């Protein structure tokens, strides 16, 4: 009864008004699964390829009709009749059908939409919530959220070169309370910015994008907001950075244009180390450029026991690249973005490899999102322990937080919230 009998792909719009792919999968029993894929603004060069039409007369060339056509023709022909409960076999069929290392023929946006929709249909068929379908009876750990409250870099139009400054409610007793901590700090920060005459408009991921004189000034405002909201920085709420350093790495230097600095990897590491000593920062994502593995080595040797060092553009949810990083002792954590690799099976493999190596895995959204909340279920289903899904505004971000609130309610007394223990790679 779980045989796939119909697949329909369509072009919809994401949270930035750009086209993305949605897919419906119908099973023999009449059950349907639907999924929509996200899209990133700052992307790693080795990510799986998101297929765009390139037709400048439609959506500035960003249409996805080619990817949709692939779903409705080639992919449909290949997977009709397959058992939706055999996720690994289905994903292998998609990988083999594409035939490239980076999904460039069919498009990772096409393969992922199908992979996700099939999983949703199979979960529905089994009468299980998606997180339980992914993780079985052992899925009970809620993720610690990394909440992006200040945007810079490619996610904003201000003088901050770092892409995200985040708050992390490590001292909350539950996920529900963690969300409350974050929301109250978000509103406190909004008032601080308003009182200073700064913009309170939000960026792609729901964070504020004020023009402040320096990164430290932004950090200090966040600390002020934590205090104003009645919380203790470092104990109840820690800080995280997403440098997205590839975006400001030019000719072997880290160029912080907003602060007039041009630094080599050692000098940039020294600045990050100074901030770590000065502020309650426990996570730094993409602290070095994706191609600067020597810089990553310097950063990891200096801060790898103190701080979670997350590879996003560095690892692009790819087990081959992650294994190389593990072997070379580069970073100590991986960011998991489902559309960087293009199937759920490959996503789960990256999470498992990270855990076996003592690396943490942070499940992540993209800057271009939809109302699809699959990553919330992945975070709980894999017991990942951490999720990064934006600020406390914009319904495309809240869709994930709200799904996690529902999951915690569903789990009841067996739900756990790891807090600081989610950062198990730190000594």
Swiss-Prot record:
UniProt source species: Polaromonas sp. (strain JS666 / ATCC BAA-500)
PROSITE patterns to which the protein is assigned, alphabetical: ENOLASE
Active site: 205, 337
Class in the EC hierarchy, top level: lyase
Presence of keyword Magnesium: yes
Listed SUPFAM superfamilies: Enolase C-terminal domain-like, Enolase N-terminal domain-like
Protein's name in the database: Enolase
Reactions catalysed, as given in the entry: (2R)-2-phosphoglycerate = phosphoenolpyruvate + H2O
Function, in words: Catalyzes the reversible conversion of 2-phosphoglycerate (2-PG) into phosphoenolpyruvate (PEP). It is essential for the degradation of carbohydrates via glycolysis.
Residue numbers binding Mg(2+): 242, 285, 312
Cofactor descriptive note: Binds a second Mg(2+) ion via substrate during catalysis.
Pathway(s) the chain acts in: Carbohydrate degradation; glycolysis; pyruvate from D-glyceraldehyde 3-phosphate: step 4/5
């Amino acid at each position: 009864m779980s045989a796939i009998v119909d697949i329909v792909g369509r072009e919809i719009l994401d949270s930035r008004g750009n086209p993305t792919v949605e897919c419906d999968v119908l099973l023999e029993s009449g059950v349907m699964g639907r999924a929509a894929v996200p899209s990133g603004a700052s992307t790693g060069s080795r990510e799986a390829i998101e297929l765009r039409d390139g037709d400048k007369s439609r959506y500035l060339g960003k249409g996805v009709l080619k990817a949709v056509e692939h779903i409705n023709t080639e992919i449909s022909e290949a997977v009709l009749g397959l058992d939706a409960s055999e996720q690994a076999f289905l994903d292998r069929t998609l990988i083999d059908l594409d035939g490239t290392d980076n999904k460039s023929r069919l498009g990772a946006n096409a393969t992922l939409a199908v992979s996700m929709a099939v999983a949703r249909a199979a979960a529905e068929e089994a009468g299980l919530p998606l997180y339980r379908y992914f993780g079985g009876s052992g899925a009970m750990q809620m993720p610690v959220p990394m909440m992006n409250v200040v945007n810079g870099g490619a996610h904003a139009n201000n003088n901050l070169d770092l892409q995200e400054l985040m708050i992390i409610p490590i001292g909350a007793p539950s996920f529900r309370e963690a969300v409350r901590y974050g929301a109250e700090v978000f509103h406190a920060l909004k008032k601080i910015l308003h009182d200073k005459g700064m913009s309170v408009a939000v960026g792609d991921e729901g964070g504020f994008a004020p023009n402040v004189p320096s990164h430290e000034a932004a950090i200090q405002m966040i600390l002020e907001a934590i205090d104003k909201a009645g919380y203790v920085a470092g104990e109840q709420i820690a800080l995280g950075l997403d440098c997205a350093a590839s975006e400001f790495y030019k000719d072997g230097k880290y160029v912080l244009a907003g602060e007039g600095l041009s630094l080599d990897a050692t000098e940039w590491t020294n600045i990050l180390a100074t901030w770590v000593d000065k502020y309650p920062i426990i996570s730094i994502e993409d602290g070095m450029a994706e191609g600067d593995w020597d810089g990553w080595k310097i950063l990891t040797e200096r801060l790898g026991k103190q701080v979670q060092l997350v590879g996003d553009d560095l690892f692009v949810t790819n087990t081959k690249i992650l294994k190389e990083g593990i072997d070379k002792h580069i970073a100590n954590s991986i960011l998991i973005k489902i559309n960087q690799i293009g199937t759920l099976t490959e996503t789960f493999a990256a999470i498992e490899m990270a855990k076996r190596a003592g690396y943490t895995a942070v499940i992540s959204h993209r800057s271009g999102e939809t109302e699809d909340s699959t990553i919330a279920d992945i975070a709980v289903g894999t017991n990942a322990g951490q999720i990064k899904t934006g600020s406390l505004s914009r319904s495309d971000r809240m869709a994930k937080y709200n799904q996690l609130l529902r999951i915690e309610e569903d789990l009841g007394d067996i739900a756990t919230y790891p807090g600081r223990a989610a950062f198990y790679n730190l000594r």
